[in-house]
Design a protein with these regions (language model features):
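Metal-coordinating catalytic core of metallo-dependent amide/deamination hydrolases
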Residues: 21, 159-296, 307
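Active-site gating loops and adjacent loop-to-helix segments of metal-dependent hydrolytic enzymes
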Residues: 98-128, 155, 159, 187-204, ...
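His/Asp/Glu-enriched, well-ordered alpha-helical/loop segment
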Residues: 291, 336-425, 438-440
Length: 502
């Protein structure tokens, strides 16, 4: 046998004796970025890193420190990027993605949504809308959202579970952390819905009991699916006693329905939410419906009285503020007073119709401008508080403070990367101000939910984007055709050359 040369033998012995890598193995290491943790100390780490194993964060710290502790199956170079918790949207509407701008400069928006959601939509409509708005959220770094299964004046598509099933199946594939709010629509009952089979329409009269039963079916099928990533919430229409006074049997019936819906939320341990609160409706919800509490989220809640702010604070009820919504223009949202009373307030988009977006950076900026203008004071709503309202405060409002909202060991790996080297984001110092004042959703490069990459380097990973937009266009066209709303696609009189619409 041929002898091994001494030099080669020495190399082989050296390699063979090398100590094994003692570093812990993780699935993903994001390193080299500016890490905005939103933890209790609100740490910002220059050249920071986040280590992920499975669905959870295992460590956050300086890149050099985590490099020494962990070896990763996959590493993301976050140089010249901001690494932060995924954004959270507390109020939206399923369906709105396919009715954008429809009737917005007239009084036709609510009737149009009622017609389409109740009588012009199909399973394919709801599925296509979920894929479309799911893709939009992923692109904008919105990792957690709550949406009602319908909209307008509480037109809920809960006449049959198949619509909610289709919606949640799509969201399951997209990969978002998602809460679907279901429940009855506004009375009286029965309400007329239409089921479409091909080109054939079948009218269906739907009762309150039927809608509540469909809601419970969806809860049993979907709540806490995929390791808790998909959840259900219960919703009930907000009653405005000043606008629609009720007495006698009509009031008794409404109260019974509200309490039955609230009881279902408690039975299943669900968040309970209401849309469209304004002056006096919060007091009614507390004193007549008796439905408020720490697991309740009230949306809009504009024009609240001092007494109502005290009620919300006393009951521990949470509030979602939609600064870009039309409702916020009709009455002031009393954010400063609510925060000073100790109420948890988060931000919401109010969906994307008729004139909005799921870009939560846009709503952060809008919230600051809205309240500073209202108070004529540029010190109102500091940028840091606005960022908290789409991260840590938002997580608390949804009852998820132990799971999401900040980058900390043990929390779910809901993480986004924001390009900090684009012209409008430069110079790169003061990253917190860049996020609050200059960033927009299109600056997000990478979105991670539950430890899974949903978008990397601006490329969606879980859906075919071209197919998503093509399906959305087709279903929007079909819904408008079924309901005969083609005229609403035209530019209205008064669009050009006037100081206000007629």
């Amino acid at each position: 046998m041929r002898a091994v040369p001494p030099a080669l033998l020495a190399i082989l012995l050296l390699v063979g004796c090398r100590a094994p890598d003692a570093r812990e193995r993780v699935d993903l290491l994001i390193r080299g970025g500016t890490v905005v943790t939103m933890d209790s100390a609100r740490r910002v780490l220059e050249d920071g890193a986040v280590a992920v194993r499975g669905t959870r964060i295992v460590a956050v710290g300086p890149s050099t420190e985590l490099d020494a502790r962990y070896v990763a199956d996959e590493t993301i170079d976050a140089a010249r990027q901001i690494v932060m918790p995924g954004l959270i949207d507390g109020h939206g509407h399923a369906g709105h993605g396919l009715v954008k701008s429809l009737g917005m400069d007239t009084d036709a928006f609510y009737p149009a949504t009622e017609a389409i959601y109740a009588r012009g939509s199909t399973v394919d409509f709801w599925r296509a809308e979920a894929f479309l708005t799911g893709a939009e959220r992923v692109r904008f770094g919105v990792t957690t959202s709550l949406s009602f299964l319908g909209g307008g004046d509480m037109v809920m598509r809960t006449d049959d579970a198949k619509y909610g099933d289709a919606y949640l199946q799509a969201m399951e594939q997209v990969g978002l952390r998602f809460i679907l709010a279901v429940g009855p629509r506004r009375p009286p009952f029965p309400q007329r819905y239409v089921e479409w089979v091909g080109d054939s329409a079948r009218p269906v009269d739907v009762s309150f009991d039927q809608q509540l039963a469909v809601a419970e079916e969806l809860i049993r099928t979907w709540h806490k699916r995929d390791d808790g990533r998909l959840q259900l919430a219960m919703a009930f229409p907000t009653h405005h006693p000043e606008q629609t006074p009720l007495r006698g049997a009509a009031l008794d019936s409404l109260v019974a329905q509200a309490r039955a819906t609230r009881a279902l939320s408690k039975t299943h341990g669900l968040l309970f939410t209401q849309d469209g609160h304004s002056k006096y409706s919060v007091k009614f919800a507390d004193e007549v419906f008796d439905i408020l509490g720490p697991d309740v989220l009230l949306s809009h809640a504009t024009g609240m009285t001092d007494e109502e702010i005290a009620i919300v604070a006393r009951t521990g009820t949470k509030v979602v503020h939609n600064p870009s919504a039309n409702a916020a223009m009709r009455e002031r949202f009393r954010l400063v007073e609510l925060l000073d009373a100790g109420v948890t307030v988060m931000l919401g988009s109010d969906g994307v119709a008729p004139d909005r977006s799921y870009d939560m950076f846009r709503h952060v900026f809008q919230a600051m401008r809205y309240h500073r203008a209202a108070w004529q004071d540029t010190k109102v709503l500091p940028a840091g508080k606005a960022l908290e309202m789409v991260t840590v405060d938002a997580a608390r409002a949804l009852g998820m403070a132990d799971e999401i909202g900040s980058l900390e060991a043990g929390k779910r790996a809901d993480i986004i990367l924001v390009d900090a080297a684009r012209p409008h984001m430069m110079p790169a110092q003061m990253p917190l101000y860049r996020l609050a004042y200059f960033a927009n959703g299109n600056d997000v490069t990478t979105t991670i939910v539950h430890g899974r990459l949903l978008m990397r380097d601006r490329v969606l990973q879980t859906v075919d984007e071209r197919r998503v937009v093509d399906d959305a266009q087709r279903e929007a066209d079909l819904a408008i055709r079924r309901t005969g709303l083609d005229s609403l696609l035209q530019t209205p009189d008064g669009f050009w050359g006037r100081s206000r619409l007629p």
